[in-house]
């Protein structure tokens, strides 16, 4: 299973890379806005920093506009993946980009049928938002299971990229189901390594070590 970091913060990306827990990066307009920098500047810096796939999201809502943005972003590097919303115009754009050999990440997926459409259009990745579904009392991880079952039934190449990850349990469940990728905020990446018994055990070992006679 691959871990992507869901961030446009270069400092966070560097920390995740140093941990060996960053196989790729996903960004979106909201994350870029938090940096206070232009999207072009942010994308250039991330491309220079991270060797894995980097999702850059279009803001146009019509297919032609999406294609213009996608072709411009793709020029920044081979690892750039164009992030496109799961709407009809987005599917049109994904189909064209697939034929041109441009990698795509179809985002804002909230149903298995939507994910099926993304795969048929030729998406490289589909991003189901598990946390947002949980927020409205639906089962985000059941959606992941449904999509994976459909993709396996028909041998689709599209990879399931679990998004809107809120806590370590989302990552655990995604891994158990066999999802290809989880894109994770840096705060949750840090939580993955934590367990109260680990902390308590380390504290005891260090306390006992102090009792060992020193020469």
From Swiss-Prot:
Active-site residues (renumbered): 83
A GO CC term assigned to this protein in UniProt: cytoplasm
Keywords: Cytoplasm, Pentose shunt, Schiff base, Transferase
PROSITE patterns: TRANSALDOLASE_1 (PS01054)
EC number: 2.2.1.2
Localization: Cytoplasm
UniProt catalytic activity: D-sedoheptulose 7-phosphate + D-glyceraldehyde 3-phosphate = D-erythrose 4-phosphate + beta-D-fructose 6-phosphate
GO annotation (BP), single: pentose-phosphate shunt
Covalent S-S links between cysteines: none
InterPro entries with a match to the protein in the record: Aldolase_TIM (IPR013785), TAL/FSA (IPR001585), Transaldolase_3B (IPR022999), Transaldolase_3B/F6P_aldolase (IPR004731), Transaldolase_AS (IPR018225), TSA/FSA_arc/bac (IPR033919)
Entry superkingdom: Bacteria
Pathway note: Carbohydrate degradation; pentose phosphate pathway; D-glyceraldehyde 3-phosphate and beta-D-fructose 6-phosphate from D-ribose 5-phosphate and D-xylulose 5-phosphate (non-oxidative stage): step 2/3
One MF annotation (Gene Ontology) recorded for this entry: aldehyde-lyase activity
Pfam families referenced in this protein's UniProt entry, alphabetically: TAL_FSA
Gene3D superfamilies in UniProt: Aldolase class I
PANTHER family: FRUCTOSE-6-PHOSPHATE ALDOLASE 1-RELATED, TRANSALDOLASE
NCBIfam families tied to this protein: fsa_talC_mipB
Similarity-based family: Belongs to the transaldolase family. Type 3B subfamily.
Protein name, entry field: Probable transaldolase
Name of the gene this protein is made from: tal
